[in-house]
Amino acid sequence: MAVPFRRTSKTRKNKRRTHFKLEVPGMVECPECGEYKLSHRVCKACGTYKGEKVASK
């Protein structure tokens, strides 16, 4: 079975993991109630989407 010659250093390990991170979701302010919501989705607070009442609370 193949094994590495040397132990992977902390620096090399961290350089490899630079792209391994969480991204912040795209939050926007609802134009109707001012609550923060995910873009292109119905507002959970007031139930509107693109200025129309879609869901009832």
Swiss-Prot record:
- Which Pfam families has this protein been placed in? Ribosomal_L32p
A GO CC term assigned to this protein in UniProt: large ribosomal subunit
Question: What is the native source organism of this protein?
Answer: Shouchella clausii (strain KSM-K16)
Does the record bear Ribosomal protein in its keywords?
Answer: yes
Q: Which GO terms describe its biological process?
A: translation
What is the primary gene name for this protein? rpmF
GO terms assigned for molecular function: structural constituent of ribosome
Q: What is this protein called?
A: Large ribosomal subunit protein bL32
Q: Which PANTHER family match?
A: 50S RIBOSOMAL PROTEIN L32, LARGE RIBOSOMAL SUBUNIT PROTEIN BL32
